[in-house]
Amino acid sequence: MRIGHGFDVHKFGGEGPLVIGGVRIPYEKGLLAHSDGDVALHAATDALLGAAALGDIGKLFPDTDPAFKGADSRVLLREAWKRIRAKGYRLGNLDITIIAQAPKMAPHIPQMRVFLAEDLQCHMDDVNVKATTTEQLGFTGRGEGIACEAVALLIKE
C-alpha cells in the first residue's frame, strides 16, 4: 500500500467558469489558472501521482506548455491514472477536502463523486469529497480563492 497527499490552491479572477471536481458550479467568479483551475482534481491528481512515485501534476502537465492551456482537468486526471495503472496499482480510496468560503459545494459533491469514480474506474464508495470553510479566516475565508487537499491510497495488484 502507498499513500499520497495532494494540495492545490487557485485565486479567484479567471475568465472561465468555476469548475471543481469536474463540475461547473454557478458562481460570478472563475479561478486564475493555466488549465481549467480545478483545484479538487489537481489535488487528487497530485495525491495519486505521489502515491505512485510519479512526481506531480506540474511535472506531467507543465504550465509552461501551451498544449495544456485551458486543459480539462478530468482529461489530465485520466492520463495520470493511466500511467498509475501501468505501474500495477489500483485505488484503495481517495479522500478530498475542498476549502472555500463560497460558493457552497454541498449540492455539487454527489456529481463530483460520480465523475471521480468514472475517471478512476472505481466504485463511488472508493471516493469521498467533502467541503469546509475556514470560518472567514485567511485567503479562502476572505473569498480570495479556493484551496483543496487530497489523500490517496494505492494498492499494488
Swiss-Prot record:
Binds 1 divalent metal cation per subunit. Pathway: Isoprenoid biosynthesis; isopentenyl diphosphate biosynthesis via DXP pathway; isopentenyl diphosphate from 1-deoxy-D-xylulose 5-phosphate: step 4/6. It catalyses: 4-CDP-2-C-methyl-D-erythritol 2-phosphate = 2-C-methyl-D-erythritol 2,4-cyclic diphosphate + CMP. One of its GO terms (molecular function) is 2-C-methyl-D-erythritol 2,4-cyclodiphosphate synthase activity. It comes from the Bacteria. Transmembrane segments: none annotated. Keywords: Isoprene biosynthesis, Lyase, Metal-binding. Its cofactor is a divalent metal cation. Disulfide bonds: none annotated. The record marks 34, 133 as: Transition state stabilizer. Involved in the biosynthesis of isopentenyl diphosphate (IPP) and dimethylallyl diphosphate (DMAPP), two major building blocks of isoprenoid compounds. Catalyzes the conversion of 4-diphosphocytidyl-2-C-methyl-D-erythritol 2-phosphate (CDP-ME2P) to 2-C-methyl-D-erythritol 2,4-cyclodiphosphate (ME-CPP) with a corresponding release of cytidine 5-monophosphate (CMP). Belongs to the IspF family. This is 2-C-methyl-D-erythritol 2,4-cyclodiphosphate synthase. It comes from Serratia proteamaculans (strain 568).
